[in-house]
Amino acid sequence: MNDKVFTKAIKKQFEFDEEVAAVFDDMLQRSVPFYKESQKISEFFAQKALQNGGIAYDLGCSTATLLINISRKLQNKATLIGLDNSEAMLQRARKKCEAFKADIELENADILEYDYREANLFISNYTLQFVRPLIREELVKKIASSLKKDGLFIFSEKVISHHSKLHKDLIECYYDFKKEQGYSEYEIVQKREALENVLIPYSEEENIKMAKNCGFSHCEVVFRWANFATFIAIK
C-alpha cells in the first residue's frame, strides 16, 4: 500500500498508529535514502555477531522486516527479539513472521524500561531520534550494559550539521530526494510539521560521543547519505 498519510491536513503530532503502520514499509523505502543498502549492512554484521548463536534485539522493530531477513540468513539458531510500543506495527509484524515462518519473539514494550537479557547484538533503526534527549543517553547506557564484551550496537539515525548553511543544504538535498520518490511539496511540509519536537536528531559527532560516554569502546559511521547515517558501536 502506498504512503498517502500526509496528502491531507494533519492536526496531531506524528505517531506510529494504524494509519502509519499500514503504509510503513512503503514510507521507509521512499523516505529513507538507500534504506535497503543500510539494512544489508545490519544483516551482514548480525550474521557476524550471531555466528555461534546468541541473542539479538531490534529496538523499534516496526513490521519486523529486518529481523525476518536476518533470520533467513543465519547459519546457527539464535534468539531474535523485536520490541515496539506500537501494537499496530506488531500486528503486521506477527502476520509477516507467520507468512515467512520466521521464529522471532515480538513484544509490545517500552525500550526504556525493558529488562534485557545479556545479548550479542542490539539494532536500532531510526529509533533513538524519537527518544527525548534527556533520557536517550540512559537508554544507550542500558544497551551497553546488556551487551557481552565485543558485542555490537548498530543504529541508524537522521543527523544534523552544526554548520548552518550546510545543514540547510543537506535538508534541501533530502527534500529533492523525496520529490523524486513522488512526494509533493505539501506532503513534505506536512510531515516536517508533524515531526517537529517529536524527532530530535543529533550530529554525527554527538552520536559517536554519546556511544563512547555510555560504555562503548569504539563507534564510527559505516554508511552515510547526506543527513542519514548508520553507526556501529563496539562494547
From Swiss-Prot:
Keyword tags: S-adenosyl-L-methionine, Transferase
Q: Which Gene3D superfamilies match?
A: Vaccinia Virus protein VP39
**Record keywords: Cell inner membrane included?**
no
- What top-level class of enzyme does the UniProt entry assign? transferase
Q: Does Manganese appear among the keywords?
A: no
State the EC number(s).
Answer: 2.1.3.-
Which GO biological process annotations does it have? tRNA wobble uridine modification
SUPFAM superfamilies associated with the record: S-adenosyl-L-methionine-dependent methyltransferases
Can you name one GO molecular function term for this protein?
Answer: carboxyl- or carbamoyltransferase activity
InterPro entries xrefs: CmoA, Methyltranfer_dom, SAM-dependent_MTases_sf
Catalytic reactions of this protein: prephenate + S-adenosyl-L-methionine = carboxy-S-adenosyl-L-methionine + 3-phenylpyruvate + H2O
The positions annotated for binding S-adenosyl-L-methionine are 35, 60-62, 84-85, 110-111, 125, 192
Q: What job does this protein perform?
A: Catalyzes the conversion of S-adenosyl-L-methionine (SAM) to carboxy-S-adenosyl-L-methionine (Cx-SAM).
Similarity annotation:
Belongs to the class I-like SAM-binding methyltransferase superfamily. Cx-SAM synthase family.
Give the matching NCBIfam families. carboxy-S-adenosyl-L-methionine synthase CmoA (TIGR00740)
Q: How does it assemble?
A: Homodimer.
Name of the featured protein:
Carboxy-S-adenosyl-L-methionine synthase
Q: What organism does the record attribute this protein to?
A: Sulfurimonas denitrificans (strain ATCC 33889 / DSM 1251)
Q: What is the lineage of its organism?
A: Bacteria, Pseudomonadati, Campylobacterota, Epsilonproteobacteria, Campylobacterales
